[in-house]
Amino acid sequence: MMMSCRNIDLGTSVLDHSCSSSSTSRRFLFGNSSKTVCMIGGRSCVGNLVFLRRDLATCRAVPAKSKENSLVNGIGQDQTVMLNLRQESRKPISLETLFEVVADDLQRLNDNLLSIVGAENPVLISAAEQIFSAGGKRMRPGLVFLVSRATAELAGLKELTVEHRRLGEIIEMIHTASLIHDDVLDESDMRRGRETVHELFGTRVAVLAGDFMFAQASWYLANLENLEVIKLISQVIKDFASGEIKQASSLFDCDVKLDDYMLKSYYKTASLVAASTKGAAIFSKVESKVAEQMYQFGKNLGLSFQVVDDILDFTQSTEQLGKPAANDLAKGNITAPVIFALENEPRLREIIESEFCEPGSLEEAIEIVRNRGGIKKAQELAKEKAELALKNLNCLPRSGFRSALEDMVMFNLERID
């Protein structure tokens, strides 16, 4: 099926579109509004464009008028923007292909991780090795390197600095420390399909291992000698504690509001991602408004990821998750799908507030969340945050690194397709 697109009005910009594709188009968000009129198989179709995807099918979009815009607006005078349409038959995005453009950076990080933890205590090293080798995605340092290289291009840097690389290592150490402590607090036996540190070595060693990694990361952070980044990352460690306290104080509480959930999700997940992306931009010495957009990108991406994770807790199996399915609900943690399902299901409130005391009540609650709108509304929330994250990237010049950041947003959403 052939598709052709004609001139479209995107609010402040009129773009001339010419493209061909053997597939249906996906939506792409451009500025505040976007409409397209396409001829698909001789039929005129009008729709909103929401998402960007790299693919074999591409459209070349050129501003009809030369207009000088700021970096935050993302399109400078006489720049050409490549809008890419997704082929439905295309293989899903994988982190391996997404991070290909920073594969060497990630390999150097993997080689350095154990050495920078230190060799003072063999037990702590064994604990760190257990989680470092547990198939982690290295998503956060990957984001550090992608933003570092995307903003380095903007600032005219030809190579990453020592500070960029050290930041990636610090971020992964902090993330790993938080996982060790999370597993202790949640009494989790499995993570990524492997036994957790506290299951293998005991709670005492796990707590000390997490503390040690936080301390070691803080020492390396101080040696970066950048006060802005030190404050930024230090706030993340504080946010971790705030998030855990907020979660522990609201278990089985069906009056938790969506704003409370989003704040807790920011503390526990998005704060670190936002600090990672902003810190990378700071070390590239870009303008403060670009660094702030990178912070907002990390925040919105992190929130979208957390919402998707909470959806998968209801839609995937224990084998797929690498941990017990519906584990959060079983422990009374009220997440986005549950909050939305509670809006119209008094029976769900009754079950949760009873703390699943009746046989089969947990399974009943899971079915209510799955089938009564909780999942659908949570998906909409994840997409809303993803759209904002894509807009935050408009301050970056077109490059393979920016495309990979956009694909990261889409990779997350593909997990719930």
UniProtKB/Swiss-Prot annotation:
Record-listed an all-trans-polyprenyl diphosphate binding positions:
191, 268-269, 306, 323
Q: What does this protein do?
A: Involved in providing solanesyl diphosphate for plastoquinone-9 (PQ-9) formation in plastids. Catalyzes the elongation of the prenyl side chain of PQ-9 in plastids. Contributes to the biosynthesis of plastochromanol-8 (PC-8) in plastids. Does not contribute to the synthesis of tocopherol or ubiquinone. PQ-9 and PC-8 are lipophilic antioxidants that act as protectant against photooxidative stress under high light stress conditions. Prefers geranylgeranyl diphosphate to farnesyl diphosphate as substrate. No activity with geranyl diphosphate or dimethylallyl diphosphate as substrate.
- Binding residues for Mg(2+) 1, per the UniProt record? 182, 186
Which residues are listed for isopentenyl diphosphate binding in this entry?
Answer: 137, 140, 175, 192
Entry comment describing in which tissues the protein is expressed: Higher expression in leaves than in roots.
Catalysed reaction, written as an equation = 5 isopentenyl diphosphate + (2E,6E,10E)-geranylgeranyl diphosphate = all-trans-nonaprenyl diphosphate + 5 diphosphate
Q: Could you tell me the EC number(s) of this protein?
A: 2.5.1.85
Q: What's the source species' lineage?
A: Eukaryota, Viridiplantae, Streptophyta, Embryophyta, Tracheophyta
Q: What class of enzyme is it?
A: transferase
For this chain's record, the cofactor binding note is: Binds 2 Mg(2+) ions per subunit.
Query: Which cofactor does this sequence's record say it needs?
Result: Mg(2+)
User: What InterPro entries does the record tag this protein with?
Assistant: Isoprenoid_synthase_dom_sf, Polyprenyl_synt, Polyprenyl_synt_CS
Pfam families documented for this protein: polyprenyl_synt
This chain belongs to the protein called Solanesyl diphosphate synthase 2, chloroplastic
* Transit peptide segment: 1-60
Q: Does the keyword Transit peptide apply?
A: yes
Keywords, ordered alphabetically = Chloroplast, Isoprene biosynthesis, Magnesium, Metal-binding, Plastid, Stress response, Transferase, Transit peptide
Q: Name the PANTHER family for this protein.
A: GERANYLGERANYL PYROPHOSPHATE SYNTHASE, SOLANESYL DIPHOSPHATE SYNTHASE 2, CHLOROPLASTIC
Record note on quaternary structure: Homodimer. Interacts with FBN5.
Q: How does activity depend on pH?
A: Optimum pH is 8.0.
Member of which family? Answer: Belongs to the FPP/GGPP synthase family.
Which gene is annotated as encoding this protein in its UniProt record? SPS2
The residues the record assigns to binding Mg(2+) 2 are 182, 186
State the Gene Ontology BP annotations: isoprenoid biosynthetic process; plastoquinone biosynthetic process
Question: GO MF annotations for this entry?
Answer: all-trans-nonaprenyl-diphosphate synthase (geranylgeranyl-diphosphate specific) activity; metal ion binding
| Location in or out of the cell | Plastid, Chloroplast
